[in-house]
């Protein structure tokens, strides 16, 4: 064995490549070994350093891959054992054990997290060269007994199913020990680069290679100063020193110092020396030179998005200077926090990248489909799960519009559960759903699912066959092929499909002869899919590489950007969480000298120093270290390592907000520039210098020219929320000149509430989602129908009998039967409505001096050639003197307010009066009023009553009164009825004023509507809060930002309120 160390200013790879070339020139076969995470980059670096740029004599690979070169022919043809397969084997083992067999873990048998921990422990045991029987000294002896039962049973299953229990390194080591490879190894030289420690498995293999290979060469970075130190605790080279010293002691060899021809920039060397001096308690009498600072940058940004954008702009600048994407490396302090953001931002700046991390399959449509399938079976055809299956795009031949229509109907009819999905859809609504088409679609969905879900407990092989048959029926494979929109997506789908078929194969192999329920089968496949990962190799090598900063090696790329280096992530504090604690691992390691667990937490300090050292030397030309103030919506502090750099004299540059400028980095990319222009267009203008204004004026002019060529438009607006007028063609279609505009009291109220709401409801005809479950509208229809029947009954039957008959016959109508007999909740609503009817009906019995002359009266009120007002009057009453009045049933409290009417928000009663005046020969003198009747079950607070007597009954009837507009002329006739006339009496002249102003409100609204321009102007009564419909989801209206666009209501003091509003009405209606 040969141990080599060198300073950070030299290239260890060049030194080791020279050693490899010498061995290759002598006829030896050389294996150049790199860590798993670096083998791809190391292969490219090694081949670059070779004069011939390639050779068959030197193979750059990993330990695992090297073992396959030697054992591929002699390895037994056994099944491959991966993590998913291991999890299934442990699940099967736990199925065969009873809870009482496992005192410690019996309650966790079906816990997926526990099974994952078992898989991790099994892999650790293999790497540590330990068996489950070596787990002595645990905190609880029962833990070892349970683990022995589980793992031994799992290993028995592996043997039965012909799985290879040995790892590739174990098979390689066994072949060497048996002397099967002596001839080959005697002609082999092994060069090892990039390691600072070996696992127990690697350590054992290394000892065998040292005894059988021609030579083993290992290199590591250690300074000569550190190598000569006797006390190395806390030294930045502590990990490498321990690594070399352990090997030197074990193999009785002295490490040698070497140098390379390539020497990197002195700035990085000087920074390393300062860093070393800080941690080995020595002092230096010099600082970084001014020109050294040109190679380092410390950035501070407010949050991650700005940080990534600054990096992207800097990369574009490097390209402008002539560098390539492959010259750039981006390191992430927290992969999970940055992974979702960095992709879209780099795409915006058109920067091709390769993320050096396996992607989880959990977000892929195939995994979502399998998960929805499993949940549909487990939760008995829940609607959300069925729809998620359809929306995955992998079920059947349905387009998006079909799925949307199916979803809309199932929500309306509340279709959920197998019973409702299996029956034909028969319920319809005013929207007239295409039931024939929906039932055909329902059958295409239900039949294959029903055939699969009816599977009883049976052999796993049979369940897999039925699942595959189901997947063929729904054309899963064909739909999977149709998902891809690009070559990259095609490659991703191929990798996901391969993992899926591997999981099915493993399940068939392990559970083929075990009896399982379908729910267990789907749950196991779903768990395997959700935990699986895949990798996609980049289509070109000229990309920006992105990976975690703790995987970096010295001198990786000319330009390195390390971002997210906050105190929480740099250094990383690794704590193991599993079935064994670190204390238990340490006790086991004390007993087993040459076989040991890796305890990450025990090596945090020296590993973090090693990582920081590699990071500070990762670049060969320029290193940028960046830290955000806020990461994952949490404030974080500077890393202690960055604080050290600041003490060395490196300035911390506050990058601030990513303002737009006329720098090359801002305008070097068309797509990014266009997105920035759009961002400017959406925000308030910021303070700009004359030079800035001139620059952006020219840029906008150029962009508009380019956009016009592409028939695109850059929108401009003076207000935050603005609307466009309808085109003349649309206005002519929606509001023909020769046809009167149709309005109603409700439509007029909506218009004055918020003009844009009128546009949505009555121009675009947008409606809220319907539901078969009764709402306030359906409740109102029911109450109207009961009272209509009651008032039509002129028989001599007692009033209570008439009421019972009206309720009974209304309940028997098919429409109300479908709605109110669907479930217990609807039946409860019906019971409440019946109570309301019984409570309100006595008011009709008391008013014996009135006669109902008409109900549910349709009217069309002609207001000239411009407007036709339509509506339905619930009831028309006639007093004993022949005067007529209008009753409007309300399911909620309502009363006429002259101020609300003046502002256009309560025109209903006055509109009905105008209609009654038009459709009857009576003049204004013979109209006694228009009123609301609140249909309610009065609630009284019994605490306020001293005793139960007539006052209690009077209070009930006081709540059941008619409230509205009444004629002062009919005051005497109204006094004997249940009419609340206080502050509600109007003279004939005043009633005429109300009618004229009501006409003015309609004409004013119609004139504005026909112009085709609808404002976003919900009303406000106080100028501080908005009461009108804001439609935030559509208009993005915000009261604090858009109060200026709200319509301010006219409000007057309560004193003389009526007279003042009438005066205003007279003025406006006669303009």
From Swiss-Prot:
GO terms for biological process: double-strand break repair via homologous recombination. The heterodimer acts as both an ATP-dependent DNA helicase and an ATP-dependent, dual-direction single-stranded exonuclease. Recognizes the chi site generating a DNA molecule suitable for the initiation of homologous recombination. This subunit has 5' -> 3' nuclease activity but not helicase activity. It comes from Streptococcus pyogenes serotype M3 (strain ATCC BAA-595 / MGAS315). Its EC number is 3.1.-.-. NCBIfam families: rexB_recomb. It is an enzyme of class 3 (hydrolase). This is ATP-dependent helicase/deoxyribonuclease subunit B. Pfam families: ADDB_N (PF21445), PDDEXK_1 (PF12705). Signal peptide: none annotated. Its cofactor is Mg(2+). Coiled coil: none annotated. Belongs to the helicase family. AddB/RexB type 2 subfamily. The gene is rexB.
